[in-house]
């Protein structure tokens, strides 16, 4: 198993206790709510897991095995739920031209054959996803910003090649120059 597939992905945060049966509010941070199913376990740290005993997607409520009272449930308030990259690839289905963010991170951003930088992370602002790019060192030495944002959509993104870890863009140099 590769080092990357051992990485835990933050997919939700447990909210406040609701009612008398140990139910809790669920704040999903993922585009894949279908991964929250009865009987599925999630990490709360590298060594501890919680297993869902019930979920109500309409009300965004969850309940965990062994947490049957408000007092028990309150111990979990504000805990993050994590899953693995391996499980995400197995359980979550992508449409054509959709990518997991962890596959985008680390890609080179290239315009007109020139590497502008490396994708450090993605950030969602409103309905648009942005590539947070760490600028190539040679460009930084030439006076450009150390990092910049590129909208991850047309017309800026021409091609995304996950296997080669290259995202071909247009207009990103203009964005970098204005940063």
UniProtKB/Swiss-Prot annotation:
Span of domain PRC barrel: 96-175
Tagged with keyword Disulfide bond: no
Localization (cell): Cytoplasm
GO biological processes: ribosomal small subunit biogenesis; rRNA processing
Gene Ontology molecular functions: ribosome binding
Presence of keyword Acyltransferase: no
Keywords, comma-separated and alphabetical: Chaperone, Cytoplasm, Ribosome biogenesis, rRNA processing
Main location: cytoplasm
Any single Gene Ontology cellular-component annotation: cytoplasm
Listed PANTHER family: RIBOSOME MATURATION FACTOR RIMM
Subunit description: Binds ribosomal protein uS19.
Record-linked NCBIfam families: 16S_RimM
Function: An accessory protein needed during the final step in the assembly of 30S ribosomal subunit, possibly for assembly of the head region. Essential for efficient processing of 16S rRNA. May be needed both before and after RbfA during the maturation of 16S rRNA. It has affinity for free ribosomal 30S subunits but not for 70S ribosomes.
Domain notes: The PRC barrel domain binds ribosomal protein uS19.
Name under which the protein is recorded: Ribosome maturation factor RimM
Organism (species): Sulfurimonas denitrificans (strain ATCC 33889 / DSM 1251) (Thiomicrospira denitrificans (strain ATCC 33889 / DSM 1251))
Underlying gene: rimM
């Amino acid at each position: 198993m590769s080092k990357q597939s051992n990485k835990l992905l933050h997919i939700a945060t447990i909210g406040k206790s609701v009612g008398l049966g140990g139910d809790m509010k669920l704040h999903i941070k993922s585009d894949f709510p279908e991964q929250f199913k009865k009987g599925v376990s999630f990490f709360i740290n590298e060594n501890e897991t919680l297993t869902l005993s019930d979920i109500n997607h309409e009300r965004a409520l969850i309940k965990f095995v062994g947490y049957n009272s408000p007092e028990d449930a309150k111990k979990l308030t504000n805990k993050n739920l994590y899953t693995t990259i391996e499980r995400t690839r197995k359980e979550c289905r992508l449409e054509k031209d959709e990518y997991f963010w962890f596959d985008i991170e680390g890609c080179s951003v290239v315009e007109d054959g020139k590497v502008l930088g490396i994708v450090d992370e993605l950030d969602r602002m409103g309905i648009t996803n942005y590539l947070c790019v760490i600028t190539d060192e040679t460009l930084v030495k030439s006076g450009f910003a150390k990092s910049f944002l590129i909208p991850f959509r047309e017309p800026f993104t021409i091609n995304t090649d996950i296997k080669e870890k290259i995202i071909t863009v247009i207009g990103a140099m203009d964005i970098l120059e204005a940063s």
